[in-house]
Curated annotation (Swiss-Prot):
Protein name: Small ribosomal subunit protein eS6
Keywords from the named record: Ribonucleoprotein, Ribosomal protein
InterPro entries in alphabetical order: Ribosomal_eS6, Ribosomal_eS6_arc
Record-linked NCBIfam families: PRK04290.1-3
One GO CC term, this protein: ribosome
Sequence similarity: Belongs to the eukaryotic ribosomal protein eS6 family.
GO biological process terms, semicolon-separated: translation
One Gene Ontology molecular-function label: structural constituent of ribosome
Alphabetized Pfam families for the sequence: Ribosomal_S6e (PF01092)
Length: 127
């Protein structure tokens, strides 16, 4: 079971959906920055852009690492933080190609569809 996290820039909210591994299989080979049709995730009319993710073992995806697996690389800054001058660190990161071992995939909405993502909530007090 994999999770996609969809960020909505207009409202500032994020939405989480659980998807099957066969849907991740359809996305295999896509890269960070690719646009995907929302019909993969029961969101017709929406266009989504892949912005990142993480593998089953927790390693984050790195945009400028063009491989499908994980790799230990030597970098001058840690992923997501600014480092100190002169210090290099060896870290394990996952490449930017989506594979079957993805557990979380982060996306943003680039084109909106006819139906809103947020479902109206029922009030408990009134019947």
């Amino acid at each position: 079971m994999a999770v996609i996290v969809i960020a909505d820039k207009n409202t500032g909210k994020t939405y989480k959906k659980e998807i099957d591994q066969n849907v991740i299989g359809l996305l295999t080979g896509r890269r960070i920055g690719d646009e995907i049709d929302g019909s993969f995730f029961e969101m017709p009319g929406y266009k989504l852009k892949i912005t990142g993710g993480s593998a089953n073992n927790g390693f984050p995806m790195k945009k400028d690492l063009p491989i499908a697996g994980k790799k230990r690389i030597l970098i001058t800054y840690t992923h997501g933080r600014k480092g100190k001058n002169g210090i290099r660190k060896r870290v394990t990161l996952r490449g930017n190609i989506v594979g079957s071992d993805i557990s979380q995939l982060n996306m943003i909405i680039t084109q909106y569809g006819p139906q809103p993502l947020e479902k109206p909530e029922e009030q408990k007090g009134e019947q």
